[in-house]
Amino acid sequence: MTTPKPTIAKISPECQTHFQDIKFRNKYQGILLKVNEESNMVVDKTLVAEGEFSELAQSLPTDQCRIIIYRYKSGEGSKLFFIYWGPDSAPQQDKLIYGNAKVTLAITLKGIDHKISASNLKEISEQVFIDRITPKTA
């Protein structure tokens, strides 16, 4: 028996609408995207606009991949983050599917400031976000 090849997920119009809602209207703090049974990228969860950073980590499944678009707000403004969540305990097939979806989304969604790939919560701690947006001094 052969393992089916991962397919490139189609991005649902809902994903693009929610992305615009984050980017231009600050309607959400973030969205978690998943690939459904029909290989469509769909919105799994939304994070409220004025939510706490801890809500992001609490929303992540421990054994499933997700793509997250997250607006991180700081004293210097806000930045959009594209996060690939592939925990070590997720099935390898899912990691391949989401890896392909990550490429498709990165091309489609314009205006992302930073990208993060994470397999554990330490890799998406608030300090990681702060380090990404803080200008480096020489």
Curated annotation (Swiss-Prot):
Its main location: cytoplasm. SUPFAM superfamilies: Actin depolymerizing proteins. Residues 7-134 form the ADF-H domain. It comes from the Eukaryota. It is found in: Cytoplasm, Cytoskeleton. Keywords: Actin-binding, Cytoplasm, Cytoskeleton. One of its GO terms (molecular function) is actin filament binding. SMART domains: ADF. GO terms for cellular component: actin cytoskeleton; cytoplasm. InterPro entries: ADF-H, ADF-H/Gelsolin-like_dom_sf, ADF/Cofilin. PROSITE patterns: ADF_H. The keyword Cytoplasm applies. GO terms for biological process: actin filament depolymerization; actin filament severing. Belongs to the actin-binding proteins ADF family. Controls actin polymerization and depolymerization. This is Cofilin-3.
